[in-house]
Amino acid sequence: SVQDYRQAMGELFAPMSKVAAKNPYSSAPVERTVDELVTVTDKNRMICDPYPRLMVARDQVNMGAAAVLMSVESARKLGVPESKWVYLRGHADMKEQKLLGRPDVGASPASVLAVREALRVAGIGIDDISAFDLYSCFPFPVFNICDGVGLDADDPRGLTLTGGLPYFGGPGNNY
Protein backbone atom coordinates (compact mmCIF):
# COMPACT_ATOMS: atom_id res chain seq x y z
CA SER A 1 0.00 0.00 0.00
CA VAL A 2 1.01 3.64 -0.30
CA GLN A 3 1.11 3.92 3.49
CA ASP A 4 3.42 0.88 3.76
CA TYR A 5 5.71 2.38 1.13
CA ARG A 6 5.73 5.75 2.90
CA GLN A 7 6.62 3.96 6.16
CA ALA A 8 9.47 2.10 4.41
CA MET A 9 10.74 5.42 3.01
CA GLY A 10 10.71 6.94 6.49
CA GLU A 11 12.61 3.96 7.87
CA LEU A 12 15.14 4.31 5.05
CA PHE A 13 15.68 8.06 5.47
CA ALA A 14 15.42 8.55 9.26
CA PRO A 15 18.93 7.09 9.79
CA MET A 16 20.24 9.46 7.10
CA SER A 17 18.82 12.45 8.96
CA LYS A 18 20.58 11.17 12.10
CA VAL A 19 23.92 11.15 10.25
CA ALA A 20 23.26 14.64 8.84
CA ALA A 21 22.37 15.95 12.31
CA LYS A 22 25.92 15.12 13.45
CA ASN A 23 27.61 16.61 10.38
CA PRO A 24 28.81 20.20 10.94
CA TYR A 25 28.48 20.93 7.21
CA SER A 26 24.89 19.71 6.91
CA SER A 27 22.30 22.05 5.43
CA ALA A 28 19.57 20.49 7.62
CA PRO A 29 21.26 19.21 10.80
CA VAL A 30 18.09 17.95 12.48
CA GLU A 31 17.50 14.31 13.34
CA ARG A 32 14.04 13.29 12.17
CA THR A 33 11.98 10.34 13.38
CA VAL A 34 10.20 8.02 11.01
CA ASP A 35 6.89 9.52 12.12
CA GLU A 36 8.10 13.08 11.43
CA LEU A 37 9.17 12.07 7.94
CA VAL A 38 6.01 10.18 6.97
CA THR A 39 3.33 12.33 8.60
CA VAL A 40 1.92 15.04 6.36
CA THR A 41 1.55 18.34 8.27
CA ASP A 42 1.58 22.05 7.45
CA LYS A 43 5.40 21.99 7.74
CA ASN A 44 5.75 18.64 5.99
CA ARG A 45 3.31 19.15 3.15
CA MET A 46 2.83 16.67 0.34
CA ILE A 47 5.14 17.63 -2.53
CA CYS A 48 4.05 14.86 -4.89
CA ASP A 49 2.34 11.73 -3.63
CA PRO A 50 3.85 9.71 -1.95
CA TYR A 51 6.63 12.19 -1.04
CA PRO A 52 6.17 14.64 1.84
CA ARG A 53 8.53 17.63 1.91
CA LEU A 54 10.96 16.09 4.44
CA MET A 55 11.62 13.11 2.17
CA VAL A 56 12.88 15.09 -0.82
CA ALA A 57 15.85 17.37 -1.36
CA ARG A 58 15.25 21.05 -0.74
CA ASP A 59 17.81 23.45 -2.19
CA GLN A 60 18.74 26.01 0.44
CA VAL A 61 21.93 27.52 -0.98
CA ASN A 62 23.03 28.03 -4.56
CA MET A 63 26.56 27.01 -5.53
CA GLY A 64 28.45 24.46 -7.59
CA ALA A 65 30.80 21.56 -7.03
CA ALA A 66 33.44 19.81 -9.10
CA ALA A 67 35.89 16.93 -9.02
CA VAL A 68 39.17 17.13 -10.90
CA LEU A 69 40.71 13.89 -12.18
CA MET A 70 44.44 13.79 -12.88
CA SER A 71 47.39 11.45 -12.95
CA VAL A 72 49.65 10.90 -9.93
CA GLU A 73 52.36 12.70 -11.89
CA SER A 74 50.15 15.77 -12.35
CA ALA A 75 49.05 15.74 -8.70
CA ARG A 76 52.67 15.70 -7.56
CA LYS A 77 53.62 18.42 -10.04
CA LEU A 78 50.77 20.63 -8.77
CA GLY A 79 51.64 19.97 -5.13
CA VAL A 80 48.41 18.20 -4.19
CA PRO A 81 49.12 16.52 -0.83
CA GLU A 82 48.88 12.71 -0.99
CA SER A 83 46.43 12.82 1.91
CA LYS A 84 43.96 14.48 -0.50
CA TRP A 85 44.33 11.90 -3.26
CA VAL A 86 41.39 9.65 -4.07
CA TYR A 87 41.94 6.79 -6.47
CA LEU A 88 39.21 5.98 -8.95
CA ARG A 89 39.02 2.18 -8.85
CA GLY A 90 35.80 1.54 -10.70
CA HIS A 91 33.46 3.49 -12.93
CA ALA A 92 30.54 3.02 -15.27
CA ASP A 93 28.28 5.06 -17.48
CA MET A 94 24.85 3.90 -18.49
CA LYS A 95 21.92 5.45 -20.29
CA GLU A 96 18.50 4.70 -18.84
CA GLN A 97 15.83 3.32 -21.15
CA LYS A 98 12.82 5.60 -21.56
CA LEU A 99 10.37 5.12 -18.72
CA LEU A 100 7.50 3.65 -20.74
CA GLY A 101 9.88 1.36 -22.63
CA ARG A 102 11.01 -0.44 -19.48
CA PRO A 103 9.57 -3.84 -18.60
CA ASP A 104 9.02 -2.49 -15.06
CA VAL A 105 8.34 1.26 -14.77
CA GLY A 106 9.03 0.96 -11.04
CA ALA A 107 12.69 0.09 -11.61
CA SER A 108 15.78 1.83 -12.89
CA PRO A 109 17.88 -0.95 -14.43
CA ALA A 110 20.63 1.34 -15.72
CA SER A 111 21.58 2.59 -12.26
CA VAL A 112 21.85 -0.98 -10.95
CA LEU A 113 23.88 -2.03 -14.00
CA ALA A 114 26.16 0.98 -13.48
CA VAL A 115 26.87 -0.04 -9.87
CA ARG A 116 27.51 -3.64 -10.89
CA GLU A 117 29.82 -2.54 -13.72
CA ALA A 118 31.75 -0.15 -11.46
CA LEU A 119 32.25 -2.98 -8.97
CA ARG A 120 33.37 -5.30 -11.78
CA VAL A 121 35.85 -2.74 -13.12
CA ALA A 122 37.20 -2.27 -9.59
CA GLY A 123 37.49 -6.04 -9.17
CA ILE A 124 35.42 -6.08 -5.98
CA GLY A 125 31.99 -7.08 -4.74
CA ILE A 126 29.43 -5.24 -2.64
CA ASP A 127 30.72 -7.03 0.47
CA ASP A 128 34.17 -5.46 -0.09
CA ILE A 129 32.78 -1.95 0.35
CA SER A 130 33.31 -0.57 3.86
CA ALA A 131 31.28 2.64 3.52
CA PHE A 132 28.48 3.88 1.29
CA ASP A 133 27.05 7.26 0.43
CA LEU A 134 23.90 6.55 -1.57
CA TYR A 135 22.81 10.00 -2.59
CA SER A 136 19.47 10.89 -4.10
CA CYS A 137 16.89 13.63 -3.91
CA PHE A 138 14.19 11.14 -2.91
CA PRO A 139 13.98 7.51 -1.63
CA PHE A 140 13.21 5.51 -4.79
CA PRO A 141 16.75 5.49 -6.24
CA VAL A 142 18.21 4.41 -2.89
CA PHE A 143 15.70 1.53 -2.71
CA ASN A 144 16.46 0.69 -6.34
CA ILE A 145 20.20 0.37 -5.73
CA CYS A 146 19.76 -1.53 -2.47
CA ASP A 147 17.35 -3.99 -4.08
CA GLY A 148 19.44 -4.31 -7.24
CA VAL A 149 22.73 -5.14 -5.55
CA GLY A 150 21.39 -7.04 -2.54
CA LEU A 151 22.13 -4.38 0.06
CA ASP A 152 19.79 -4.29 3.06
CA ALA A 153 18.37 -0.86 3.90
CA ASP A 154 19.49 -1.44 7.50
CA ASP A 155 22.98 -2.67 6.55
CA PRO A 156 25.31 -2.16 9.55
CA ARG A 157 27.72 -0.17 7.37
CA GLY A 158 25.00 2.44 6.89
CA LEU A 159 23.90 3.89 3.58
CA THR A 160 25.41 7.36 4.00
CA LEU A 161 28.51 9.06 5.37
CA THR A 162 27.17 12.58 4.97
CA GLY A 163 23.46 12.31 5.70
CA GLY A 164 22.04 12.05 2.20
CA LEU A 165 20.87 14.71 -0.20
CA PRO A 166 17.61 15.69 1.57
CA TYR A 167 19.36 16.27 4.92
CA PHE A 168 23.03 16.96 4.27
CA GLY A 169 22.55 18.80 1.00
CA GLY A 170 24.19 18.89 -2.39
CA PRO A 171 25.82 21.37 -4.77
CA GLY A 172 22.76 23.53 -4.32
CA ASN A 173 23.33 23.33 -0.55
CA ASN A 174 27.10 23.97 -0.28
CA TYR A 175 28.05 20.27 -0.56
Residue positions per predicted region:
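C-terminal catalytic subdomain
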Residues: G169, N173-Y175
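Conserved "HGTGT" condensation-loop signature of ketosynthase/thiolase-family condensing enzymes
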Residues: S1-A67, V72-S74, V80-G169
